[in-house]
Design a protein with these regions (language model features):
Chain B
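Charged docking surfaces used in two-component/phosphorelay signaling
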Residues: 17-25
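His-Asp phosphorelay/catalytic-motif detector in bacterial-type signaling
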Residues: 47-49, 74-80
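Alpha4 helix (beta4-alpha4-beta5 surface) of REC/receiver domains from two-component response regulators
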Residues: 61-65, 88-111, 118, 122
Length: 386, 145
């Protein structure tokens, strides 16, 4: 990266423009000046300076308006306010509109140099943060696709060949051979499932997810999940009973991932249910919220396990009898998805009696976030421009 | 031989070995191309009734490019195209439902690796059959005026 920074000075007083240019002339900067807000903004858009000094009181566009527009255009540009009427109020006002620092007139050459150096440091940090964030993102994406392809490809080739052998296409297997091949196939299967779950989890990008939000009919989604598990439940003679409040308004969310959550919870419920028992699924509308709860009469969760069941790769001490070991990722992913919807997922359980998982979704996601809107905007500002 | 010719484009020889075996046991004649480039060449000098293509080949999702290219070709687009992939996240989030999309992913069938033998053979039969009915329809339409 070139260390030559571009500085723009917007001030209606020629003296200020000239003296500032002179003070910085010896430094390694490209310096531009503008006599009013409009031409300053034009120049900002044209060559995206690193630093902008803005006089607060100018004819035409005021300094505060200029500040605001620069900030909207590119929040990583560091802005400093120059003003003749330095009051706390005007300083606070300028800071609120995104100014990084404040320079009262008249100022000495040293003061000006110092504030410039500080602002350059700030700009450098902002740019570094963007680069780092970007690199991290690239690494994450590459890693996910490497895992998908490099780890899965050999396993898929193994599995496809096993299918051919198991289907007797290259000669009949004797019972022992068949048994061993089945075991091999099952192990490869669960390894593949683990990789799939893991890549699913790493590929959930919360901000991407939010872009896809639209009204989702939750009862329809729940019955879809019920349908998927009907056969599995029937095999254990477990009945799935759905109880849905009459009029449930749609929830703003992402259908695909929400279905994944309900399937996860229902899959667990069936897995941990006793034979010949029932699972009750309740959908209720509340105060601006929607509750979906799934209760089973299964083995339940040990008290000491409860605080950790939503953690990555955590598996409870009590495993379902006869079922395959889970990956310990299902609930972790579900929690991530529900968090992205500004909702919550909780569990109540009594060992030996059963567990109830409850998902609470706000009708309109985003409402709770508007309170901290400025804060969020601030955090986004750092990487919005990349 | 039942006379139907299948072109299999996939860069994993060990995977291809198994799929080729399944198809040949069902009496299809199978030609394998281990890259999109080989696949295009095969399509130029041979006649096929079905193309099976893998998604992740070479440097990325080149199978998708193959699918788009074939479906843009005036002649080749009549060939039924079956896509087989092990990469779910490349084609649709969580892969729920049918990821086919007429412009993004213009294929006639889609299966996830590893493919169950019966499922693969059923899909192949279905695609070959729908191709025949489409041809019949076209012939009929040609006769009418």
């Amino acid at each position: 990266m070139s260390d030559r920074y571009t500085i723009l000075i917007i001030d209606d007083e020629e003296v200020v423009r000239d003296s500032c240019s002179q003070i910085l002339a010896k430094g390694n900067f490209r310096i531009h000046t503008a006599a009013d807000g409009d031409s300053g903004l034009k120049m900002t858009e044209e060559f995206r300076p690193d630093l902008v000094f803005v006089d607060l009181k100018m004819p035409g566009l005021s300094g505060l308006q200029v500040l605001e527009r620069i900030n909207r255009f590119d929040p990583t540009i560091v802005t400093i306010v120059i003003t003749g009427y330095a009051t706390i109020d005007s300083a606070v006002d300028a800071m609120k509109r995104g100014a990084y620092d404040f320079l009262p007139k008249p100022f000495s050459a040293d003061e000006f140099r110092l504030i410039t150096r500080r602002a350059v440091e700030k700009r450098k940090l902002l740019l570094d943060a963007i680069t780092l964030r970007h690199e991290k993102e690239v690494i994450r994406e590459n890693f996910t696709s490497i895992v998908s392809h490099e780890l899965k490809s050999p396993l898929l080739a193994v599995q496809q060949n096993l299918y051919v052998i198991l289907d007797g296409m290259v000669g009949e297997l004797n019972p022992t051979q068949k048994e061993m091949m089945e075991r091999v196939k099952n192990r490869v299967d669960s390894l593949l499932r683990l990789i799939n779950t893991w890549t699913d989890m790493t590929s959930i990008d919360v901000s991407e997810l939010k872009k896809r939000f639209k009204p989702v009919d939750i009862p329809a989604l729940v019955s879809k999940a019920v349908e998927v598990f009907q056969a599995q439940a029937a095999a254990k003679n477990v009945t799935l009973v759905t109880d849905c409040a009459r009029s449930v308004e749609p929830v703003n969310g992402d259908e695909g991932t929400l279905l994944e959550v309900f399937m996860n919870i229902m899959g667990n419920a069936i897995k941990f249910s006793e034979r010949d028992s029932s699972i009750s699924i309740k959908i209720e509308g509340g105060d601006g919220e929607l509750h979906v709860s799934v209760s089973d009469k299964g083995v339940g969760i040990q008290k000491e396990d409860i605080p950790f069941i939503f953690d990555d790769f955590y598996r409870g001490k009590v495993q379902a009898s006869g079922a395959e070991m889970g990956s310990g990722l299902g609930l972790a992913i579900s929690k991530r998805i529900i968090n992205a919807h500004d909702g919550s997922i909780t569990v109540e359980s009594e060992p030996g009696k059963g567990s109830t998982f409850t998902v609470v979704l706000p009708r309109e996601t985003g409402k709770s976030r508007t309170h901290g809107k400025e804060k969020v905007a601030e955090q986004f500002a750092i990487w919005r421009s990349d | 031989m039942n006379g139907k010719r299948i072109l299999l484009i996939d860069d994993d020889p060990d995977y291809v070995y198994a799929v080729k075996m399944i198809l040949e046991k069902a009496n299809y004649s199978v030609r394998v191309s281990y890259s999109p480039k080989e696949g295009y060449a095969a399509l130029q000098d041979g006649e096929f009734d079905l193309v099976i293509v893998d998604v992740m080949m070479g440097r990325g999702a080149e199978g998708i490019i193959v699918a788009r290219k074939l479906k843009k070709d005036r002649e080749l687009k009549k060939l039924p195209l079956l896509m087989i992939t092990g990469i779910r996240e490349q084609t649709g989030f969580f892969f729920i439902g049918d990821p086919r999309h007429e412009t993004f992913l213009p294929v006639d069938g889609f299966l996830e690796k590893p493919v169950n033998t019966e499922v693969l053979l059923n899909k192949v039969r279905e695609l070959l059959h729908s191709d025949q009915t489409a041809e019949l329809k076209q012939e009929k339409q040609g006769e009418e005026p």
